[in-house]
Amino acid sequence: MLGQIFPNLTCKGIDSVDETSSAADVSGKVLEICQKKASAVTNNSDFDLVIVSDTMLQDPDVDVLAMGKANDAIEAAAMLHRLSGRRHRVWSATGVCYRGSWEFHLNQAIVEFDDLSDEVLVELVLSNSWVGKAGSYDLAGEMGEYARLVEGDEATV
């Protein structure tokens, strides 16, 4: 998304960040993990601006449970099945560092899934569109046909 605005953007992953959190609720968890990612960025980077983020889904049944990224196709299928035909809240935290000073923002959105048939679930899992995605889906990708944003901004999801 930012690459369209900033053609000379450099995107780098941050390895070995502990993505566990002691926060009680999902919003706190996602913010804490985003802050850990910010701490992992070296202060002497050659960049004018640094952005880190994290996204999690709030379990549709248990508000304090977070749904992150699936580790494999079986977990992805289970997550998509759990979200099928339901609404859920998505939390995103973003940290922006400019001139050595960090500022953090927390946003939420609500997404609703259609009832997903077994065939659609298999198709979504086999497409690998779930890889690296919180809740095992990409609203701007293949899931966009089966889900809609009810509240909030698409950038949050």
PLM regions with names:
Residues 1-7:
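N-terminal beta1-alpha1 ligand-phosphate binding loop
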Residues 8-9, 48:
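Hydrophobic anchor at the start of a short beta-strand
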Residues 9-20:
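A short beta-strand-loop structural module common to alpha/beta enzyme folds
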Residues 24-156:
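Anionic-ligand binding patches
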